Amino acid sequence: MAAKRRVSAAKDKWKLKQWYVIYAPDFFGGVEVGLTPADDPEKVLNRVVEVTLKDITGDFLKGHVKLYFQVYDVKGQNAYTKFKGMKLARSYIRSLVRRRTTRIDGIFNITTKDGYKLRVMAMVIAARRIQTSQERAIRKIMQEIIYKKAEELNFKDFVLEAVNGKIAAEIAKEAKKIYPLKKAEIRKIKVLGEPEVAA
């Protein structure tokens, strides 16, 4: 009997839940990216949803770009999100790193023009084994371009240029002057802090 009551209580609890529609941030088009159930709108707040750039743009070539959005506001049945981070799928990264190539990684903590603090992880794959001095030169190029972009762009524009490959393309353009490249990528972004809003 106790087991039946537990099952019945679980069913009743599920019946009380409502579905909330989750929307991407405005600068990603504000499109619907998922549904989530909850018996209280407060429980929807801070939930994180993972989607791919393909889900948002319809571009099948962007399925390896994972985006993370966090719910910050609920109005009625609608849940609105903010960008929390991105990363490339591990399988995609593995496909780039082959024998006799060199992977150069850079991790940079930046502050955007409008005060958002981000950790940006960039990656360059050289077509062959390269010298340590060449690695250092390429890493310096990565740093200079990412820092310059942070100074010039607000949070939304920086994220879009990173996610859409524009920053990586600029890194590749300069880094290939040091050594022929296979690929340059922004492989991960994490939001570390947001600007304080004046009371």
UniProtKB/Swiss-Prot annotation:
InterPro entries in the cross-refs: Ribosomal_eS1, Ribosomal_eS1_arc, Ribosomal_eS1_CS
Single GO molecular function: structural constituent of ribosome
Transmembrane segments: none
Record bears the keyword Ribonucleoprotein: yes
Keyword terms: Ribonucleoprotein, Ribosomal protein
Gene Ontology annotations of biological process type: translation
Lineage: superkingdom: Archaea
PROSITE patterns: RIBOSOMAL_S3AE
GO cellular component: ribonucleoprotein complex; ribosome
Family: Belongs to the eukaryotic ribosomal protein eS1 family.
Descriptive protein name: Small ribosomal subunit protein eS1
UniProt source species: Pyrococcus abyssi (strain GE5 / Orsay)
Gene assigned in the entry: rps3ae
